Amino acid sequence: MSRKQLALFEPVLLVQALTDAVKKLSPRAQWRNPVMFVVWAGSVLTTLLTLAMVTGQIAGSALFTGIISLWLWFTVLFANFAEALAEGRSKAQANSLKGVKKTAFARRLRAPRHDAQADNVPAAELRKGDIVLVKAGDIIPCDGEVIEGGASVDESAITGESAPVIRESGGDFASVTGGTRILSDWLVIACSVNPGETFLDRMIAMVEGAQRRKTPNEIALTILLIALTIVFLLATATLWPFSAWGGNAVSVTVLVALLVCLIPTTIGGLLSAIGVAGMSRMLGANVIATSGRAVEAAGDVDVLLLDKTGTITLGNRQASDFIPARGVDERTLADAAQLASLADETPEGRSIVILAKQRFNLRERDVQSLHATFVPFTAQSRMSGINIDNRMIRKGSVDAIRRHVESNGGHFPADVEQNVENVARLGATPLVVVEGARILGVIALKDIVKGGIKERFAQLRKMGIKTVMITGDNRLTAAAIAAEAGVDDFLAEATPEAKLALIRQYQAEGRLVAMTGDGTNDAPALAQADVAVAMNSGTQAAKEAGNMVDLDSNPTKLIEVVHIGKQMLMTRGSLTTFSIANDVAKYFAIIPAAFAATYPQLNALNVMGLHSPNSAILSAVIFNALIIIFLIPLALKGVSYKPLSASAMLRRNLWIYGLGGLVVPFIGIKVIDVLLTLLGLA
């Protein structure tokens, strides 16, 4: 469930955006956008000319020059309004987050245990490494890791999700976020950041975007727009001596109007708004991007690394069968598997305990009463188990158990090898159980591929995006699930090192890679990936390594992130195409009007049949300003996105925005010309 979305044109935001748009009329603000700075300079110049004509200092039509000046100011104002409205929506989202920061005091413990002596201190004084105690009803004062206790936590202020979540020490659910509320029980938390560096602080700074850095594509497009502006500026400057030589010099007002209509003011005025709105749409999907660069990279991604569990499959693998080795009865295997899983709190571990209970009435036993030592699972060992007196029982992946058995002087039986292959071919995950160096058998864990995921992968393939499934399963299981899900490739028996190596391999081929992760062991790969979406429920290390955080902790969100990134790039490209195509109609309006008196042959270009030279110039300038206003909703919402190949997408956008950019101005300029004529202003 996402946070409540703002309407596109909230009345309060509109009023604030209008105020900010006027404030942005200062030369310092305009200098940041070179294209609009030229329009601003033209507005100032024509305003001065109007005043000079009114006072009789120079000859000319003060009414015509004044109207041109007014609409040039409107052009600048409308561009400012687009940017201010996009920024206002982001600031409104930031203000809703600021309301979460209301923790006044915290219980700072003198020792890392819940019964230690506590001091009440202002939450702002907490530093990295401080230990705090939070109880039911308290607001968590800092980002951190739970080191003791377990509690139900309301994270709706951050994620928008009303259902509470469990946070507890150990495992992947130990990370807590400052500003969330404890609903029950208590937690002892080790603060992981200093004041001003919390996740909430970074969210607020990001969505406010006051000092938003331009992305590489934005910089490249800005350079192109500046180059076009310089070319048209030089071209316009040379027209005055040509017209003067012909005996009928074009006025400065007409030359300024011509320049403004020639340069790409439409995309120049909307470019910043598109970038801000892209990050805002990402937040609307409950994904926090650390920068516009990350959103832009998402649009260029051509390789997706997707975790199998939770992304491709439902992620609730359950033990379905015990397959004993030759010479071992099924009950013995089930008993050993249950013992190895007694302290395993994963869904798979609990399902093994339950299956043993259902099949053979084997009751759970307390690890402490057995005087046993639990061996936890690690990404390196890829197995877990239990030590009871002289018994050493392990369960884990095939390769991990094989290495374990061989290191203890045993061998891997051929019949178990065959059972492993049979389980894997069915798309289930085989776990092998061993006691000492003796293989006892195989546990089959079954998972279900998500409905509709194969069709989504087919869409990504049409867009030129390669999908790679990442799994800890063996190659046979991975191949079976990959075939069922329809992914392009897979990485089986994945370790953190293997993930990192795979990302580097794709990047060496010139590809951009996106992935998700939630654990500390994912941090190196997240740091290496071009688009790294960390889960909000994940560890602090994972969130710091990624350049995006998914507040819903939904690994499938990576596909939506790519869609939003591509939509932002498409919006920018479509409006650039529309802006440049627009210029063609303006040529047919202004060039005959400006130069037909000197070169009568140019009247042949007046294909729109505009009423007079003055009405033609006014119509083009007015249309140039109004089109920015009409395109603001498109810039903020983004163009309609469909998963197509690059060539199909290019053809579609050229038809819609290229042809549209040619046709719309002809119609718009003609309509404005008719209205001006009816009003007697032409």
Swiss-Prot record:
Membrane topology value: Multi-pass membrane protein
Positions that bind ATP: D344, E348, F377, T378, A379, Q380, S381, R382, M383, S384, K395
E.C. designation(s): 7.2.2.6
Organism superkingdom: Bacteria
Key words of the record: ATP-binding, Cell inner membrane, Cell membrane, Ion transport, Magnesium, Membrane, Metal-binding, Nucleotide-binding, Phosphoprotein, Potassium, Potassium transport, Translocase, Transmembrane, Transmembrane helix, Transport
Bilayer-spanning residue ranges: 34-54, 58-78, 219-239, 254-274, 588-608, 616-636, 662-682
GO molecular function list: ATP binding; ATP hydrolysis activity; magnesium ion binding; P-type potassium transmembrane transporter activity
Disulfide topology: none
Protein name per Swiss-Prot or TrEMBL: Potassium-transporting ATPase ATP-binding subunit
